[in-house]
Amino acid sequence: MDLILLLGIAVALLVILVTLFFFTKGKGSQESGKYNHPRVENEAQAAPRRAQVVRNQRNRARVAAAPAEEQHHAAADGGSDEDEIPHADFNGEKMGAKKRAKLEAKAEKKALREQELKIREDQKKKDALLEEQRKVEAEKEAEEERKREEAEKKAREEKARQEHEEYLRMKEAFSVEEEGFDQEQEDDKQNMLQEFINFVKSNKVVVLEDLAVQFKLKTQAAIDRIVELQKDGRLSGVIDDRGKFIYISEEELNAVAKFIKQRGRVSITELAENSNNLINLVPVSAE
């Protein structure tokens, strides 16, 4: 930029010198025509004039260089967007037009910046409004989702409650049926036990193994059952060493007791000899 300024100053000086040359030449011609005689100057008088002319040229060069320097400073203040190369111009009207154009350009740029700023602000407001609308929509969707989940939860809870109530009703029904079934089983068990007792009473003498087979029991289970029935007083008798059970009724026991009481002292041999008369060992079905 300094090189351009120097070139401008040099061009301005050159223009001034050329202008002064033609101006001086024209003035000399006019003076020679006015007085109609050649002007003879003294060398002693011409030297100061030449010095004055040189001083005047320098002053005019400084005056011409001042607008160019001002133009350079204005270009520096205007920013990098001013790419024009300043040129020396001595016409005040032309310099005013350039300055006016520059001011108009600055004003236009300022207006453009303000317009862009306004557009950005409007866009920010629009974006903020859209963001607010998105937030409202998101909150609305979240509320609808919450209500939908709550409704689904209530529906699941209601369904679970109904299923639980149905389960309780079915359980109660099964319990009643099971109680009836248990009662039936108990009745069957009592019936089987009574059949067991009746079988022993009717046969009088039963082999324990055959008794177990008859009622689908193990031999030990049959023996245990007889022992329990004896404790309950529902059966009476003895189990001999040959694996048989001899049923003795209440009447027969009373007869044996009466026989022993009448005889006083009775031996086992005497009791065995009279047992056939006291105890009936014949099965009821065979009688």
Curated annotation (Swiss-Prot):
Keyword Chloroplast: no
Stretches for region Disordered: 28-102, 135-164
Family label: Belongs to the DDRGK1 family.
Subcellular location: Endoplasmic reticulum membrane
Record's GO cellular component terms: endoplasmic reticulum membrane
SUBUNIT field: Interacts with Atg9; the interaction is transient.
Organism per entry: Culex quinquefasciatus
Chief location of this protein within or outside the cell: endoplasmic reticulum
Function: Substrate adapter for ufmylation, the covalent attachment of the ubiquitin-like modifier UFM1 to substrate proteins. Required for ufmylation of Atg9; protects the nervous system during aging, possibly by stabilizing Atg9 and supporting its function.
Bias (Low complexity): 44-68
InterPro entries given in the database record: DDRGK_dom-contain, DDRGK_domain-containing, WH-like_DNA-bd_sf, WH_DNA-bd_sf
Keywords, sorted A to Z: Endoplasmic reticulum, Membrane, Transmembrane, Transmembrane helix, Ubl conjugation pathway
Membrane topology per record: Single-pass membrane protein
Biased composition annotated in UniProt, kind: Basic and acidic residues: 85-102
SUPFAM superfamilies, per database record: Winged helix' DNA-binding domain
Tree of life domain: Eukaryota
Record topological domains on the Lumenal side: 1-5
PANTHER family: DDRGK DOMAIN-CONTAINING PROTEIN 1
Record topological domains on the Cytoplasmic side: 27-287
Protein name: DDRGK domain-containing protein 1
TM helices/strands, residue ranges: 6-26
Tagged with keyword Membrane: yes
Any Pfam family matching the protein: DDRGK
Gene Ontology molecular function terms on file: ubiquitin-like protein ligase binding
